[in-house]
Structures are given as structure tokens and as C-alpha cells.
Amino acid sequence: MRLSCPVVLLLLPCASAAGAQAAPNGYPVKPVPLADSVEIALAVSAAPPELSNQATVYAVRDGQVLTLRRGSNGSACVVARDLHGGSLYPICYNAEGARTVLARELLEVRLRSLGASEDSVERAVAAGYASGQLETPKSLAMAYMMSPRQVLFSSPRPEGRRVGAWHPHLMFYVPGATPSMFGLASEDAEPISVSGSGTPRAEVVVKVQKWSDGTPVAVPAKTP
């Protein structure tokens, strides 16, 4: 089933694609859609089956958010992408993450699918939080990125480098979090790190030692 998804992010204005200039590596490359069955399988591979088997699955096609599968446990999964060719970011959210953080994720993917520059994406996200159209979590919100099929880049910007299947990890959303709150000296500490320090989208990233299919991590990986 493919249904348009009227989430709050669709109320935000589209960011301009101006400034999305081609880089030497081919960036920006608009995401290539996958068949629905492939998209669903890839999305749910982000989390253990206990969560993902009953999760709602979304996809973004040409700026439109579609519901590929209706779930029953309040959680949600999607394959996020940026404008690096081949990027695949399977991610699943628990119920509170699906209620709040997912809207920001889909907004970013939606704008990138239309060719928006990263500066435009960041402005749209900031405006969404400032206006209240994007909500911060009221209780524990988390995401799973445990898919062995992930193809990550170190940054969504043109200078981002391909990392591939980096490391299975969990993300806990703590608006305004800073490394010092956790006794950390920097954002990229190991095995716990903080991304987006001090912002409404701050998240605590925790590495785990197995992929969602139970395969152990073979070699310790460095933070991208």
C-alpha cells in the first residue's frame, strides 16, 4: 500500500535548490527509488525484529512522503538518504521517536530529494523547531541504526566521505545535550558520543557490538 503521508513536515516551505552545485565526486546525486518490497526490507533491517516487524515503514519519492506499510506498535522505519550517490541510512524509531524526531528526518530527506542545498535544509529544520512545527521529545526517544546494509557518509555536505557500513549503533535524543553532561571531553568520544551538541536535535550515539541480524562486529571501527 502506498499512501501520501500528511505529517507536519509537509506544511513547511520547500527549501530552494539553489546552491546545490556539482562537486568533483558527482555530488549532488538525487536518490534513486527502490522497489517497495526492497525499500521495506532495507528499512526494517535497521532494528531487531522485535521492533521492526510491526513498525510502520515510510519512503520519500520526489518530495512526497509515502506510507509503504502500516504498523501496529507505534514505531517507524525509513531509509534516509542524502545527495551522495548510493547513500542508504536505514533507521527505525521507537514510538516517541516516531512521533517527534521522524518528522525532522523526513523533512530533511524530502528536501534533499528535491535537490535542496544543505544550508537550505538546515534553515528549514531550524525554522521548524523555532515555530513548533517540529517537536522535541517529551519522553525517551531513540533510533536504531543497526543495518549491516547501511551505506553512510561522514557528512551530508559535498565534502562528506563514504564510510559504508560503519558500525551498528543506537541514538538517544536529548535536546540540548552536550558532552560534558555525560562526563565526556569531546563530541567524538568512544564508545559514546554526542552529535548536534547543544541543539534541539542533540543525540547521544552509543555503539553496539552486533548488527540487527545478530552478526557480530568483526573489526572495531573509527568514528567517521
Where are these regions (language model features)?
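Primary mode marks residue(s) on the alpha4-beta5-alpha5 output face of response regulator receiver
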Residues: 22-224
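N-terminal signal peptide c-region/cleavage motif recognized by signal peptidases
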Residues: 13-17
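Bacterial N-terminal signal peptides that target proteins for export
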Residues: 1-7
